[in-house]
Amino acid sequence: MDTVGLFSAEVEHLFIEWIKKHIKKGDLTLFERFFKADPWIVNRCDRSKITVFMWICIYGRLDFLRFLFKQESYPGEIISHYRRDKDGNSVWHYLAEKKNHLLLEEVLEYFGKIGIKVCFRNFNGITPVMKAAMRGRTLSVLSLIKYGANPNQKDYLKGFNTWDWAVFTGHADLVKSLNKDYQKPLFMHFPLYKLDVFHRRHKKKPKIIITSCEDNVYEKLPEQNPNFLCVKKLNKYGK
């Protein structure tokens, strides 16, 4: 019985791998045929537990998404957007880190009709809005916040929130946008010296750092939010 089960699982995984190739190619006609035969194909997953719906989003297939949305009587009738992969990532994590902001907006707008939770953590405590911050996806961060993402949630490993990740990964434009567009208090959770040590160790030049005190090696940015002090490093290492 166990052997039969393993064989069935392997066949399932091979089938999903084949479907993935056709999604990547953009073969919507073939996908439509499979969907009409078995609508639940969108929730089937590969060995990494990444569902077909996730792969559609990963490959940025807006035409596939619009086809799927037309097949449901209401959002979520068939498509499960809360499924997790082997690392605990949901489809929102994958959408958040993509360059194509319109794809995220399309899915948020569709599932937002019934109310959605976009603060789901993966197994490291990383939320979709943190993923977007790590990649410097400014529009995605703001869209997720608009739909209820909490930028002050911390991850499990470093204790960083969205703001911390934006600073830590050196995305100056995102930091400036958060200063301007997000009016609630945001807080830093790691000491300044740790950030500096990290950048020195990995030979990276930080664009933005945070300090709680003014110093002659720092210059305030004009976009400063009164909730916190955003500064640009001026010494020879930070240039």
Swiss-Prot record:
The protein exists in a 28 kDa and a 32 kDa form, probably due to post-translational modifications which are neither phosphorylation, nor sumoylation. InterPro entries: Ankyrin_rpt (IPR002110), Ankyrin_rpt-contain_sf (IPR036770). The keyword Repeat applies. A motif (FLCV motif) lies at residues 228-231. A motif (Nuclear localization signal) lies at residues 81-87, 203-214. Induction: Expressed in the early phase of the viral replicative cycle. ANK repeats lie at residues 48-80, 87-118, 124-153, 158-187. SUPFAM superfamilies: Ankyrin repeat (SSF48403). One of its GO terms (biological process) is symbiont-mediated suppression of host NF-kappaB cascade. A motif (PxIxITxC motif) lies at residues 206-213. GO terms for cellular component: host cell cytoplasm; host cell nucleus. Keywords: ANK repeat, Host cytoplasm, Host nucleus, Host-virus interaction, Inhibition of host NF-kappa-B by virus, Repeat, Ubl conjugation. IkB-like protein that inhibits the binding of NF-kappa-B to DNA, thereby downregulating pro-inflammatory cytokine production. Forms a heterodimer with the NF-kappa-B subunit RELA/p65 and prevents the activation of the NF-kappa-B transcription factor. Inhibits calcineurin function, which is required for the induction of nuclear factor of activated T cells (NFAT)-dependent immune response genes. Prevents the binding of substrates to calcineurin without affecting the phosphatase activity. The C-terminal region contains the docking motifs PxIxITxC and FLCV, which are required and sufficient for binding to host calcineurin. Belongs to the asfivirus A238L family. Interacts with host PPIA. Interacts with host PPP3CA/Calcineurin. Interacts with host RELA/p65; interaction of the 32 kDa form with host RELA results in the formation of a stable complex with NF-kappa-B. Interacts with host PPP3R1. Interacts with host EP300; this interaction inhibits the association of host EP300 with host RELA, JUN and NFATC2. This is IkB-like protein. It comes from African swine fever virus (isolate Pig/Kenya/KEN-50/1950).
